[in-house]
Regions:
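Structural marker of alpha-solenoid helical repeat scaffolds
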Residues: 29, 63, 97, 131-133, ...
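Position-specific recognition of the canonical hydrophobic site in helix A of tetratricopeptide repeat
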Residues: 38, 45, 72, 79, ...
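Residue-level recognition of tetratricopeptide repeat
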Residues: 33, 67, 101, 136-137, ...
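TPR alpha-solenoid repeat register
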Residues: 36, 70, 104, 139-140, ...
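Terminal, low-structured helical/coil segments at or just beyond the last alpha-helical repeat
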Residues: 21-27, 143-197
């Protein structure tokens, strides 16, 4: 009987290496870089496929966990879907990694405006974003105009609206429409102020 056991042990020992022909699990290697995932995600956004876009932005973060553009893009998707808490999280994370990031700063300000809260922080964020020369400047001024109208700071609102009008390209019809709406609101507010004699 002991001899039978020893033969069984030898056979098992010999067969184990013989299984090396079986396929081994291979770790998935993502062929795309973080910027490539971002580009693909942005193309999905343009096509209206927010779920696919979100998946690509998340994949970019798997490649580079501190990739600021992916946090901003996820914040933009969340803001577009009215998920303000999620948008705030993503923009805050972007600002933790890049404190002067103008897009994240302005968009976080817009989140707070939408929530009707933290108006002092809105102004600070917008002013921070304005310190960087970028094509965003008219949008940041629009953010400030919206804030000042909410605060009934009509002179300040008028000033930033004039600045935004002066630098908004005529081809940017969506922003020009928004600025026109703000000017109309400003005119209404001025008309409610009693004339002083």
């Amino acid at each position: 009987m002991p001899q039978t056991w020893s033969w069984a042990f030898v056979v098992a020992f010999v067969m184990i290496p013989g299984c090396s022909w079986l396929p081994h699990p291979v770790a998935y290697q993502d062929p795309l870089t973080a910027p490539e995932h971002m580009a693909l995600g942005e193309s999905y956004v343009q096509q209206g496929h927010s779920d696919l876009a979100s998946r690509e932005f998340e994949a970019a973060l798997k490649q580079q966990p501190n990739y600021v553009p992916a946090f901003v893009a996820l914040g933009n998707l969340a803001f577009h879907n009215q998920s303000l808490t999620a948008a705030e999280f993503y923009y805050r994370r972007a600002l933790e990694l890049s404190p002067a990031h103008p897009v994240a700063a302005n968009n976080l300000a817009m989140v707070y405006l939408s929530k009707e809260e933290k108006f002092d922080e809105v102004e600070r964020l917008a002013r921070t974003a304005l310190q960087h020369e970028s094509q965003l400047k008219p949008y940041i001024l629009e953010t400030l105009a919206t804030l000042y109208l909410k605060q009934d700071k009509l002179i300040d609102a008028q000033t930033v609206l004039e600045q935004a009008d002066a630098i908004t390209p005529p081809t940017n019809t969506s922003l020009l429409t928004r600025l026109s709406q703000l000017r109309q609101e400003l005119t209404k507010r001025w008309s409610r102020i009693p004339a002083q004699h």
